[in-house]
From Swiss-Prot:
The lineage of its organism: Viruses, Duplodnaviria, Heunggongvirae, Uroviricota, Caudoviricetes. Keywords: Capsid protein, Coiled coil, Late protein, Virion. This is Major capsid protein. The gene is l5. One of its GO terms (cellular component) is viral capsid. It is found in: Virion. It comes from Lactococcus phage c2.
Length: 480
């Protein structure tokens, strides 16, 4: 029986085919594969291996089953299994890694122009057996030189596939999507393990309970791309965040001479007492909505979730605590509302327009002022009239124009702000981390550093100095 020995480039790795697909690597180098005619009937057998960046096919084709006159002018096309792994898509192109080649076809119109037959030799069946042994020895030699025997490769791939399936089953069993509390535990485990890797060198921070907390000096500044997900931070490039970690007994570097807490004597040094805070308490410390971790069922989804939804949720929570504070002060925020430290002026008003004017004057250290109020209070402000009975604002005036009329930069409405109450602060001077040793923080970009973002729990700090903020409340208002 006449057969043709065929050798060719089954797929040039890293190149785009006509379907917008790129194969970056394969998982079954050295495995046997069927050779088909245009992805239909079987016409021969062979195996695939790697030579440089090319997947090479070596095999035999039965002349009686494949009648094309010039196999050497024929292209090649691979069929593959992605093993359940989704393609990484960039600009409409799908990139696949560690795929399993299931078959290689001879075709006159290959989807990848670089995939083609490079060598053809005609011989008898008896010669085929001898050549098959020789070719096999050649490929085995190449594989052995690479550190892996060909006959062991199939077992290794099978073992890896089994491990992948076991891990998948284990993950699905331990984190069922219908139980958000399990997803939360998974998230906190990941967070705890990441935080445990962080260095144990820290400094005192301006928390309400700063003397009771030990923190690491791995700071990160949130980038403008993510800061602007929430308009209250437009232009506030001094928003810095930091994570909590466990402390080593005897470490005495949490205190920096000369640091102070808002509301205390600036010249009075603080006593550096320490207390470890377990990473698992980060959720309670932040008082974040439990929904932040719902739907997270594997590490890939966790990264994607952290990079999108979690960023927005945390910023919104920081805004809330920044202005209203927490009921018991456990989260370390100095809320502007009902501040008793003398650093945030508490103003009662009868005329909303005049009250905001007075509050802006209290923040006169610079012009970078933000005004925050509820939508209902804003609606009232739009209708405000002067002493002459005329409206103070044009009915088509935008928030920016109204803010500018007070000498402010931003005017934001938030549904969680109590009615008839207004927060005014200077966003260039407001720092979420009130350390005075800012030269030692490690800046990072959330778009590229998922691991660092994952390892950091976002927490807030305090207003730094007087003439930065004021809080308005309508006289006699219950603030509901």
């Amino acid at each position: 029986m006449k057969v043709k020995a065929v050798r060719g480039i089954a797929n040039p790795l890293g190149t785009i085919d006509a379907h917008g697909t790129v194969i970056e690597s394969i998982a079954n180098a050295g495995d046997g594969v069927d050779i088909l005619n245009r992805h239909r009937e079987k016409i021969g057998s062979g195996f695939v291996h790697l030579e440089g960046d090319n997947v090479i096919l070596t095999g035999y084709v039965d002349e009686e089953q494949y009648t094309a006159e010039k196999i050497e002018e024929t292209g090649l096309s691979v069929g593959f299994n992605a093993n359940g792994v989704k393609a990484r898509e960039i600009d409409g192109v799908g990139y696949y890694k560690d795929v399993t080649i299931t078959e290689v076809s001879l075709t006159p119109l290959p989807s990848n122009k670089g995939a083609k037959v490079t060598k053809v030799r005609e011989e008898n069946k008896g010669e085929q057996e001898q050549m098959g042994a020789n070719e096999t020895q050649e490929i085995m030699k190449q594989a052995i030189e690479a550190g892996v025997k060909v006959r062991e490769l199939e077992a290794k791939v099978e073992e890896l596939n089994k491990e992948r399936e076991e891990l998948k089953k284990e993950r699905e069993a331990s984190i069922p999507s219908e139980k958000p509390e399990d997803a939360e535990r998974k998230f906190m485990r990941e967070l705890g393990s990441k935080m445990a890797e962080m260095p144990e060198q820290g400094f005192l921070r301006e928390f309400a309970n700063g003397a009771d907390l030990n923190v690491v000096n791995s700071l990160g500044s949130i980038t403008s791309k993510y800061a602007r997900k929430s308009g209250i931070y437009d232009g506030a490039m001094k928003a810095r965040f930091q994570g909590l970690t466990l402390a080593e007994d005897g470490v005495d570097d949490t205190f920096i001479s000369g640091t102070f807490k808002a509301g205390t004597d600036k010249n009075k040094s603080q006593t550096a007492t320490k207390r470890s805070l377990r990473p698992q308490m980060a959720e309670a410390y932040l008082q974040m909505d439990k929904a932040t971790v719902r739907g997270v069922n594997d590490s890939g989804a966790l990264s994607e979730y952290v990079m999108s939804e979690m960023v927005n949720r945390v910023i919104q929570k920081v805004e809330y605590n920044m202005i209203l504070g927490s009921v018991d002060g456990s989260n370390g925020f100095y809320g502007l509302k009902t501040a008793t430290d003398g650093w945030t002026k508490q103003i009662e008003y009868t005329d909303l327009f005049e009250g905001i004017t007075d509050a802006v004057a209290e923040c006169s250290i610079s012009d970078a002022i933000t005004i925050v109020m509820s939508p209902q209070t804003f609606a009232e402000l739009r209708k405000a009239k002067g002493t002459d009975g005329h409206s103070r604002f044009n009915e088509l005036a935008t928030k920016e124009q109204i803010a500018q009329s007070f000498g402010a930069v931003n005017l934001e409405t938030r549904v969680w702000m109590p009615k008839d109450e207004v927060a005014v602060y200077n966003h260039d001077e407001y720092v979420l981390i009130g350390d005075l040793n800012v030269e030692n923080y490690n800046d990072f970009d959330l778009r590229y550093n998922v691991e660092q973002w994952l390892s950091e729990t976002l927490v807030g700090g305090s207003i730094r100095g007087k003439n930065r903020s004021a809080y308005l409340k309508k006289k006699g208002s219950l603030g509901v």
